Amino acid sequence: GCDYSAEIHSTGRHSLRARVVACHLLENESPLRIHLGIPLAKGQRMDYAIQKAVELGVEKITPLRTERSVVKLDSKRLEGKREHWHQVIIAACEQCGRARVPALEPLQALPEWSQAARFGIVLDPEDANSLRELQPPATDVHLVAGPEGGLTGREVAMLRAAGFHGVRLGRRILRTETAPVAALAAMQLLWGDF
């Protein structure tokens, strides 16, 4: 991505004309290519998780439908939410100085999303493994945390069958919006650019 310098030539009530005078290549993207799956969450939780994930360098974000997803959206409300989340992503990019806007993928069911993963991590408070015990990923990473109420045993088993590594983030159970942020920060520290 680039930042551009421009000279303003004219302004109107609802317009502006400018000429680009320089392109400044930004090299602030994470070496980790993380695709975050976020189960639909109520209130501001989804916004918070998306905002912080962008600040922490994710490449793609996919809203997920899980068995315990509390939020149910019809197609009209979903489109409005997608537009809102895209604006959250853009604002987070502006705040943290990213020139590349992470992709916001369409809503998917968890099983469908997990099939595209070559290296996956499922945050599971029941698991005994930590991120430190995993080898640094040589490919894109799919990361998923549970919704309010957590992933079901069937969902965790399905993810493991798809090759996902189960990871516990300490001894405490984290909220649905906190868990991905904590995991992303730890991943950047272990394998990324922190």
Question: Where in this protein do the model-derived segments appear?
Answer:
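Short beta-strand-centered aromatic/proline hotspots
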Residues: D3-T11, V21
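RNA substrate-binding interface of SAM-dependent RNA methyltransferases
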Residues: R13-L16, V21-I121
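Fold-independent oxyanion-binding glycine-rich loops
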Residues: L40, L107, L123-E126, P147-E148, ...
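Residue-level recognition of oxygen-bearing side chains
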Residues: R45, A109, G150, T178-A179
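Short, solvent-exposed amphipathic alpha-helical segments in soluble enzyme
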Residues: K52-L56, P136-T139, M158-A162, A183-L184
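A short acidic, often aromatic-flanked loop/helix-cap motif at beta-alpha or helix-coil junctions
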Residues: Q108-S114, A128-S130, I173-L174
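Active-site/ligand-binding-proximal alpha/beta "capping" segment
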Residues: G120-A157, F164-R168
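Structured adenosyl-cofactor binding patch, chiefly the S-adenosyl-L-methionine
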Residues: G153-F194
